[in-house]
Curated annotation (Swiss-Prot):
Region (G4 motif): 183-186
Cellular compartments annotated: Bud neck
Binding site for GTP: 44-51, 78, 104, 184-192, 240, 255
Name of the featured protein: Cell division control protein 10
Function: Plays a role in the cell cycle. Involved in the formation of the ring of filaments in the neck region at the mother-bud junction during mitosis.
Domain spans labelled Septin-type G: 34-306
Length: 357
């Protein structure tokens, strides 16, 4: 039996109005009712302004500092995972956001493999999602805790990457969308900032990090150009501020320093606006889709292949069983919520609802 290939279709205009053009409105209405899920992890040493930046990005009080308030406070023994969950409402669009903080990262005397709890957390979220997918009677909409973006905070020291940062960026960029930023860049002069950015960009190329956004043949020309413009800015040199100050008679979000005052929304002084627009106005959906179609799909394929191989050889312990066993054990030890109250089974969080200001 031969199958006739479909011929090139001619695009015709219906003689009368049909109404299928309303499908975009139907999709929009359904999505608006459900809301959108976005999960962002912040990684960096204490004192780099991680909580302040997240609150500034979303113009809401989403998280509080989990680091040491003073040198007299004890250092966290291990890297922890703390999740804060909120719902933001802006112009009838609801964004359900999980902010994943990582107190203790890079703060120990011996920071060897301090990124492992982060890698395990990311993989565990993939593993949970896969288990839900493979359930015989799964929910219509699967709760998504997969990490869509990792903001990696680099100290503004003007030096090459430390081995800790090299290893962490390498491991994390293999499994998630990593966006490096220069924290508290207002501590640098514009010339120092420019030189430091060039140094870090050369370091990224040297170590071949898989930094987001990625190249793709599926992109339109304008999307490809936008990504090139963004890559030229990475790492974003930023400063965050949750307060308003007066500059030239105008109230703006900014910070006062010993050199004067900085308006964080002035692109000549700070790249905060570029980072905000990138994360929320141009690439929010792509971050979510890339997580699902690239990082999760890679994880899923490996796990299903391991399951198949394990089924054909009952005496062999599959990589899936190893990953799940190790990650679940670590989850119970490392993952605490911001209130310190135990919460089962895999990770713990606090929840809240806020309207974006």
């Amino acid at each position: 039996m031969s199958i006739e290939e479909p011929s090139t279709q001619h695009i015709a205009q219906p003689q009368k109005y049909v109404g299928f053009d309303t499908i975009t409105t139907q999709i929009e209405n359904r999505l608006l009712k459900r809301g959108f899920q976005f999960n962002i992890m912040v990684v960096g040493r204490s004192g780099l302004g991680k909580s302040t930046l997240v609150n500034t990005l979303f113009s809401s009080k989403l998280t509080t500092s989990q680091g040491r308030k003073s040198p007299s406070e004890p250092i966290e023994k291990t890297t922890e995972i703390k999740v804060a969950s909120h719902s933001l409402l802006e112009n009838n669009v609801r964004l359900n956001i999980n902010v994943i903080d990582t107190p203790g990262f890079g703060d120990q005397i011996n920071n060897e493999k301090c990124w492992e709890p982060l890698v395990k957390y990311v993989k565990e979220q993939h593993s949970q999602y896969l288990r839900k997918e493979l359930t015989a009677q799964r929910d219509k909409f699967l709760a998504d805790t997969r990490v869509h973006c990792i903001l990696y905070f680099i100290p503004p020291n003007g030096q090459k990457l430390k081995q800790l940062d090299v290893q962490a960026l390498k491991k994390l960029s293999e499994i998630a969308n990593v966006v490096p930023i220069i924290a508290k860049s207002d501590s640098l002069t514009l010339d120092e900032r420019s030189e430091f950015k060039k140094l870090l960009q050369s370091e990224f190329m040297k170590y071949n990090f898989n930094i987001y956004p990625y190249d793709s043949e599926d992109l339109y020309e304008e999307e490809r150009q936008l990504n090139e413009d963004i890559k030229s800015l990475i790492p974003f040199a930023i400063a965050g501020s949750e307060t308003e100050i007066e500059i030239n008679g105008e109230m703006v979000r900014g910070r006062k320093t010993k050199w004067g005052a900085i308006n964080i929304e002035d692109v000549s002084q700070c790249e905060f606006v570029f980072l905000r627009d990138f994360l929320t106005r141009t690439h929010l959906q792509d971050l979510i889709e890339t997580t699902a179609l690239t990082h999760y799909e890679t994880f899923r394929s490996k796990q299903l292949i391991a399951l198949k191989e394990n089924a054909s050889n009952p005496n062999r312990q599959s990589q899936l069983q190893k990953d799940q066993g190790q990650t679940s054990q670590q989850s119970n030890q490392d993952l605490k919520n911001t209130s310190g109250v135990p919460n089962a089974p895999m990770f713990q969080s606090t929840t809240g609802t806020a309207a974006a200001r």
